[in-house]
UniProtKB/Swiss-Prot annotation:
GO BP annotation list: nitrogen fixation
Record family assignment: To ferredoxins from P.putida and C.tartarivorum, ferredoxin I from A.vinelandii, ferredoxin II from D.desulfuricans.
Lineage of origin: Bacteria, Pseudomonadati, Pseudomonadota, Alphaproteobacteria, Hyphomicrobiales
GO MF: iron ion binding; iron-sulfur cluster binding
Name used for this protein in its record: Ferredoxin-like protein
Domain 4Fe-4S ferredoxin-type: 56-86
Top-level division of the source organism's lineage: Bacteria
Record's keyword annotation contains Transferase: no
UniProt-listed SUPFAM superfamilies: 4Fe-4S ferredoxins
Function noted in UniProt: Could be a 3Fe-4S cluster-containing protein.
Record key words, sorted: Electron transport, Iron, Iron-sulfur, Metal-binding, Nitrogen fixation, Plasmid, Transport
Amino acid sequence: MTASVVRIEDKLYQNRYLVDAGRPHIKVRQHQSPSPNLLALTVVCPAKCYEVNEDGQVEVIADGCMECGTCRVLCEESGDIDWSYPRGGFGVLFKFG
């Protein structure tokens, strides 16, 4: 009997999200040019919620956020983002298995 290998993408696909429309729990603060920490978020966020737009500004789309806290830890000192937990009942719904 051989154990099949399950890809991480397949496991993450099982998660569900209840989006609180119009009330994102992460906001990028206004900036003239993105700090090194903001630019790092475009690479280190496991859910790929951060991207650089055509104007060179870092934007966040929190709908697929896994609430892991990577961005919170990275930007805590600089204050580049405002991060709070989603309202009760909203956010990621993890499905294990």
